């Protein structure tokens, strides 16, 4: 388990990561607008595809409520570009190849699968206010049903 656990009221850790088009996206560039930042293990895998498509299907709901949506994974921008195109996504996916942002947000740590322990990406979602403060931190979420749960938690 990661030693980092962000809680409501915490300042979101800064990041500068390339998106699917290799354009740097920073936490500061999200300032002034509420944001949903979600961390996922790998693009184009069943669970991550489901989660991304669920965010896409609800994107109008989130944007109408003033939220931008950003996904972060260890994938390279080239893979993210293909994933965005294949799934027709209309939000940025960021590449965190060295896991710096994952670790800063506590979205990387000890996982268990079939009795085996290993280090990996912890599927996590953070809701940030206009000033970059965490208003909601959700760790170890399930891909299926996560976006529906998030909308309920946000009253959307």
Task: Tell me what each language-model feature is.
Residues 1-156:
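Chalcogenol-based redox active-site neighborhoods
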């Amino acid at each position: 388990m990661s030693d980092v656990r962000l809680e409501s009221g915490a300042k979101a850790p800064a990041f500068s990561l390339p998106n699917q088009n290799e354009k740097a996206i920073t936490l500061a560039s999200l300032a002034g607008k509420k944001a949903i930042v979600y961390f996922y293990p790998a693009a184009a895998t069943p669970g991550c595809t489901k989660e991304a498509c669920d965010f896409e299907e609800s994107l109008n709901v989130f944007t109408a409520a003033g939220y931008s949506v950003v996904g972060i994974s260890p994938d390279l921008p080239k893979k993210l570009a293909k994933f965005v195109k294949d799934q027709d996504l209309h939000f940025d996916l960021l590449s965190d190849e060295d896991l710096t942002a994952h670790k800063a947000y506590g979205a990387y740590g000890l996982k268990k699968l079939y009795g085996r322990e290993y280090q990996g990406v912890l599927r996590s979602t953070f809701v940030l206010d206009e000033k970059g403060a965490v208003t909601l931190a959700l760790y170890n979420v399930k891909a299926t049903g996560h976006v529906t749960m998030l909308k309920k938690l946000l009253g959307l």
